[in-house]
Amino acid sequence: MDLRHLIQDVPDFPKPGILFRDISPLLRDPDGWDEVMRQLGDLCTELKPDLIVGIESRGFIVGTALATNRKIGFVPVRKPGKLPGDVLGIDYSLEYGSDRLEIHADALQGHPRVLLVDDLLATGGTARATVELIEKAGGDLVGCGFVIELAALGGRQQLPVEIPVKSLIIYS
């Protein structure tokens, strides 16, 4: 099933010159969403993760649905100050500034096999930082899954070459 027709292009959002790829129509379409879960579920069958890690915020939507579907746990990676208790964090650079991501310090104890999921792979900065955070927390990253990849922005090249990356929709 081709999922592209369920992605809405929103020009000039969140600022002029940006073409935002909105997954909201995909989320509303039960057949389309089922196809997302099937394809990412196939990735889980292949890679056998113990946990799904999702990046705030749309990665939570994809990740919790997939984790529930596969009957495995979910771990959120959040913006700073959103998780109670002890956390591990990583600072990373953006095109125009910097940001920080955090994970519970004990979330990946025991070196679980981790699949990282998010709605979008663009420049790869956030995904790369999350990969580093997973490793810092003790997880064994076995793969990455994305609903959309903006290939022209080179995000895939920011991820470890030995890690399988699956994107369901690729825009060149």
Curated annotation (Swiss-Prot):
Annotated metabolic or biological route of this protein: Purine metabolism; AMP biosynthesis via salvage pathway; AMP from adenine: step 1/1
Keyword vocabulary terms for this entry: Cytoplasm, Glycosyltransferase, Purine salvage, Transferase
Source organism superkingdom: Bacteria
EC number: 2.4.2.7
GO CC entries: cytoplasm
The reaction(s) this protein catalyses: AMP + diphosphate = 5-phospho-alpha-D-ribose 1-diphosphate + adenine
GO-annotated biological processes: adenine salvage; AMP salvage; purine ribonucleoside salvage
Annotated family: Belongs to the purine/pyrimidine phosphoribosyltransferase family.
Name of protein: Adenine phosphoribosyltransferase
Gene that produces this protein: apt
